[in-house]
């Protein structure tokens, strides 16, 4: 069995951001030499997410608006968590909604994604360095 483990690092200039990481993950799959297997892509921070969806700008905007309605950043005093000196309770909730990781099948040496599916890193409390784990296993 072959395996590859890599860490991707992100430091976004904005509090919230969505970064398409599909090409980077595909490159790692090629480097791994795995033809049939699985690829795990996992946000290693509790205010960031990895998810799969369409890479359409309107949809990314809609996510931002929808998530802010569900868990608004302000007023920060509305969250018990923020009474500890933090101001990011909303980011924890946004991550919970968007998910922690994705697992994608590798078939014939390529990510087995649907026609519009792309892998994204979602940042909900940016402006500091965070990592994403990519773990590829298979034959």
Show the residue positions of the predicted features.
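Active-site histidine-anchored catalytic micro-motif
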Residues: 1-139
